[in-house]
UniProtKB/Swiss-Prot annotation:
Protein name: Urease accessory protein UreD
Record's subunit section: UreD, UreF and UreG form a complex that acts as a GTP-hydrolysis-dependent molecular chaperone, activating the urease apoprotein by helping to assemble the nickel containing metallocenter of UreC. The UreE protein probably delivers the nickel.
GO cellular component labels: cytoplasm
InterPro entries: UreD
HAMAP family cross-referenced by the UniProt entry: UreD (MF_01384)
Job description of the protein: Required for maturation of urease via the functional incorporation of the urease nickel metallocenter.
Gene that encodes it: ureD
Pfam families assigned: UreD (PF01774)
Length: 279
């Protein structure tokens, strides 16, 4: 590792005799990982943990995940990502690098980012995957936190997610929020809501029939948030959600992930051992 990070995690998963094992678990600085054995399907399940409770101004973090051929892993954050105020104007950054080999399957279920008053944050995620691999990837951002409980008091938030299949860029999504320069309540931004989440699913098993069936499934639920599903140019879809609370949004995310798990892979619903999972 040539660059020094304030927190660094590297997880590697392999298939051994039909069972996925973690062959690499490295942690450094403020970052830690914790295993959980609650998944009824025997899928390795890891929490990403920040020992400081949040990201401090100017800090840089790296998460690297490698899923080898035929392996299946589930990775999530223990809590939302708190980005503390940046009084000196320095940028806080996190980079995530994911590699998925042939017929591998990763469920990366990150909680939303909560930017504090005056914070500046840049998050990048690059996923390199084989065309036969399966991916569920979620993240999000809220209206933030301030002592006065006023929304959108942070200065800068940028999130760039890119997916490559066989070295070709097939998906690129960027969220850029500068509340001092933008009206966060108008059409095209938060539109009066306080929480935004997105979910990307890529799999050779996702086609237009699956997307329509998922849409119908979600419409049959009693949901509090607004959402929209779009098919990708490749075999996949993207779900975007605006909601009153992060818990409302996560309910939709988990419903989508469970539908994919059950319909495509014959797996039981997610059990992430988080408070809002039991609501």
């Amino acid at each position: 590792m040539t660059q020094v990070y304030d927190g660094f995690v590297h997880l590697g998963f392999s298939n051994r005799n039909g069972r996925t094992i973690s062959h690499k678990k490295y942690q450094e600085g403020n970052s830690r990982v914790s295993a959980d054995n609650s998944d009824a399907n025997g899928v390795p399940y890891y929490f990403l943990i920040n020992m400081g409770g949040g990201f401090v101004e100017g800090e840089q973090y790296q998460v690297t995940i490698d899923v080898n051929k035929d392996a299946h892993a589930l990775v999530t954050t223990q809590t939302p990502t708190y980005v503390y105020k940046c009084e000196k104007g320095q940028l806080t950054q996190q980079n995530t690098s994911i590699t998925l080999e042939e017929n591998s399957y990763l469920e990366y279920m990150a909680d939303e980012v909560i930017p504090y008053l005056k914070s500046r944050y840049f998050q990048t995620s690059r996923i390199d995957m084989d065309k036969s691999a399966h991916l569920i990837y979620s993240d999000g951002v809220t209206a933030g936190w301030s002592h006065e409980d006023l929304p959108f008091q942070y200065h800068y938030f940028r999130n760039l997610t890119q997916i490559y299949q066989d070295n070709e860029l097939v998906y690129s999504d960027q969220t850029l929020l500068e509340p001092e320069k933008q009206d966060m309540f108008k059409l095209g931004y938060f539109e009066g809501w306080r929480n935004y989440n997105s979910l990307v699913m890529v799999s050779p098993n996702i086609d237009e029939t699956f997307v329509k069936a998922l849409q119908k499934h979600l419409e049959g639920l009693n949901l509090e948030s607004d959402f929209a599903i779009s098919s990708l140019d490749i075999s996949g879809l993207v779900l975007r959600i605006l909601g009153r609370t992060a818990e409302d949004n996560r309910r939709i995310i988990y419903s989508c992930a469970d539908y994919f798990r059950q319909e495509i892979h014959g797996l039981t619903p997610l059990n992430l051992r988080k408070n809002d999972m039991r609501r």
